[in-house]
């Protein structure tokens, strides 16, 4: 029974997954497609956590000489006997994953690179004594293993030439050209960009790829994966037989991520069919080529949690697996037009953008449109259509936030940004606090409207009215807590005959403040909403808790909101 199989949470080693009997969503058609759409160098660009590393590990297991062919028993590729006979286990493979090449300095990142290369060199230790190699070639291999103080000795030139040298030695040993697999090729560039050594890392990667992929006569073919397609002029200079399979390409569009039918089968296998709608709402929505796919990391993690707790709620697994600095970068640079576009996305609408798929990292901040492009290629936005630009042969993409989880990324980043904005605006906060204490409804409304005019709304326009009211309640609560740290503020606590939205206990022991929040669908309804709030305070006797504590001077406010405007009514009871 499939539901007795372990779920591969965090397992990206194909051999381990198959030998240890983990559940596997069959992606071996990738092998067939790769060979039928052959290119000397193929780059797959996909967002984080979409199965890139597992697929690369699967390719290694298929092509590598001496592989255990039983790993593929019962999988799609085993049905193509002719292809398996010709290619399975027939090539030496070099496999590097660059996902851990990082450091605060270039030297730290270089050492991390050397450790990864050294691990692969050590795996090929049989070359040191190969009788197919000349003594000079054996010494060349041993030159890659020289240690000093427990660390491999590599300089830049040695690292750059290492892949090409290993290819040559493996070809000499086996009499077969080499398959090179490089996973997460752009992580070192991303980290270098973030930490200020981008040019040095570009030089290193360009040199390594130039020798390994361009002038390597011992190369059968190479496959690379990453999140971004770095422009050919930056990294892949001179590569002629080079294909890029991005998220817009229909080829291979179902081989990274789970399709709807695969998710339905997974849920059925574990007896969780009833959770289909929530899984789709939270983790589906990505459009690669002509395929609609789910994030596999999310689906596997959620099903695993459901096995332990049938009442488990969807979580933001993808968000928590790494940083979300791109969204924050967009928000920090947003002008009024960009803020409006973000609000439309949050509300579930589409925006239209011309997308560049071949940026370099050092171009990301050149224009705000470049940030939109990177948000698209890294999975924060997805395409639902195209629009032809006027007087042009070019097209703009219609972009949306793919699902609830990614919407949560935007919401959380906007909230953090807004907290920082509020914390740094002492003048507005002081005026807000003073207006409340002085019962100055005009100044209070003006300051609230100023603040809301600067914010990015995270209001879901499709949400029911009570949820919209909750949004404004949370917004006001955050502002009040930032306006006067000496106030004791209680939210939605029981008082009198019901629950008051907000109770404030200032330093003055005689003074108490009650605030009721209302949502109005239209601006013309703000007056009536304020009146309803004031009537509710009196009818429900929300002031009783404060009076029971000896606070005899009570100020009450009804505050009504509509979009980015509010109206305030106040009274002393």
PLM-predicted stretches and their roles:
Residues 1-64, 68-80:
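Walker A/P-loop-proximal flanking segment of P-loop NTPase domains
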Residues 9-18, 101, 108, 112-160, ...:
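Conserved P-loop NTPase mechanochemical-coupling segment
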Residues 545, 549-573:
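Domain-level recognition of nuclease-like catalytic cores that cleave nucleotide substrates
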Residues 242, 294-541, 566-573:
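Extended alpha-helical interface modules used as scaffolds for assembling large macromolecular complexes
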Residues 121, 162-173, 200-220, 542-545:
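Substrate-engagement module of ASCE P-loop NTPases
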Residues 10, 26, 61-126:
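P-loop NTPase motor core
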Residues 214-219, 230-248:
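Short regulatory helix/loop adjacent to the ATP-binding pocket of P-loop NTPases
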Residues 234-237, 245-304, 341:
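Amphipathic alpha-helical segments of the small helical/lid subdomains adjacent to P-loop NTPase cores
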